[in-house]
């Protein structure tokens, strides 16, 4: 069995304790609680309970889902979509994908290095069954047949 890993990467405009980030930080727990109660949500496998891996001005938010469709509903409908509309208040553009989707064996918790490999692959190769996006998605079957370039 396979599950969908979603890694969201963001470059913050300021440190998490800066007043500019206050609304974002204040809403993290609510958004995470909504994710946990959403159909298809499996887990948020990170070292910190709030689901964020923080490295300087970069944030990595991981979540595991049963399907692309379940994640897509959570992401683009409801309260989370309102936060997405405000993302430019808190996050800067940067070169590279701001998220990646990929299929992983159920129960496997990806490391930061594994996620980085998928992000780099998406940036260099475009969407493939190894690393893809909502707009260019692939099935587990396609992933199993895919050979890395």
Task: Indicate where each model-derived feature is located.
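Conserved aromatic-histidine-acidic binding/catalytic patches
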Residues: 19, 62, 71-75
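Extended cationic-aromatic binding surfaces that line active-site or macromolecule-binding grooves
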Residues: 41, 64-65
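Short S/T/G/P-rich N-terminal loop/turn motif that feeds into the first structured element of a domain
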Residues: 1-57, 70, 97-149
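Short hydrophobic/aromatic beta-strand micro-patches
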Residues: 11, 62-64
């Amino acid at each position: 069995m396979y599950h969908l890993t979603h890694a969201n990467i963001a470059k913050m405009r300021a440190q998490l304790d800066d007043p500019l980030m206050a609304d974002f930080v204040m809403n993290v727990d609510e958004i995470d609680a909504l994710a946990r109660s959403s159909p298809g949500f499996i887990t948020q496998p990170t070292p910190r309970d709030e689901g964020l891996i923080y490295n300087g001005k970069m944030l990595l938010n991981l979540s595991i889902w049963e399907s692309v469709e379940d994640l897509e509903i959570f992401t683009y409908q409801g309260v989370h979509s309102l936060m997405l509309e405000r993302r430019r208040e808190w996050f800067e553009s940067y070169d590279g994908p701001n998220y990646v989707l990929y299929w992983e064996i159920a129960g496997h918790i990806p490391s930061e290095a594994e996620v980085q490999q998928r992000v780099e692959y998406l940036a260099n190769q475009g969407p493939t069954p190894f690393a893809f996006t909502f707009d260019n998605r692939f099935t587990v079957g396609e992933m199993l047949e895919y050979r890395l370039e």
